[in-house]
Amino acid sequence: ISGLILVMMSSVFVGCGKSSDVSSDLTAKEVAAKIIEANYIVAPMEIEDDMAEEMYHLNIDDVEDYAIYETQRSPGPGFIMIVKAKDGKVEDVKNSMEEVLADKIGQAFYPAEQEVAENATIEVDGNFVSLFLLNSEVEADAEKMYNDLTQK
C-alpha cells in the first residue's frame, strides 16, 4: 500500500504546480517546525543562512522565509527544505531546489537514500516551494501535513 501511495503522490506532484493563489499565514519556519515536532526526521539539524547559500544553492535575497532540516543520522533519508519565495522569485527558488535535488541524488550512498532522492519531486504551492526526502513510512503523512499547513 505504501508503494502505491508513493506512486500516486509522485504522479500528483509531477508538474510541481498548484493554484498560484494558494497561500498561508504561516511562515516556512513555522510549517517546518510542525513537521519536525511530528518526528518525521530522526535527529534533525537546522541549516542556517551561510550553509543554505553555500551548500543548498539558496539565494537568501529571493526568499521571505525558509527552513532546511537534515537528519544527523546515517544511513537513512531525512531532509526537508521549505521556502516561502518573494513574489516573482518562485521559479528562481525552484531552480535552486532542482540543484539541491541533483546534489542529493549524486551524494546518495545507500540504496534507500538513492531511491528516495530519485523519486522525490519539488512541490510549488503559491509562493511555497518544498522538497522532502523522507522514508516511505512517513513521507505521505509529512506531505499531507505540509499541504494542510500551507493552504488556507
Protein language model annotation of sequence segments:
Residues 93-101, 143-150:
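Short amphipathic alpha-helices in soluble, non-transmembrane regions
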Residues 72, 82, 113-152:
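A short, solvent-exposed beta-edge/loop patch
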Residues 17-20:
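Bacterial signal peptide processing site
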Residues 44-75, 118:
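Short, compositionally biased low-complexity segments enriched in polar/charged residues
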Residues 11-15:
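C-terminal motif of bacterial Sec signal peptides marking the signal peptidase cleavage site
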Residues 76-87:
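A short acidic-to-branched-hydrophobic micro-motif
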Residues 1-3:
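Bacterial N-terminal signal peptides that target proteins for export
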Residues 97-122:
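An anionic, turn-rich surface loop/hairpin at beta-sheet edges
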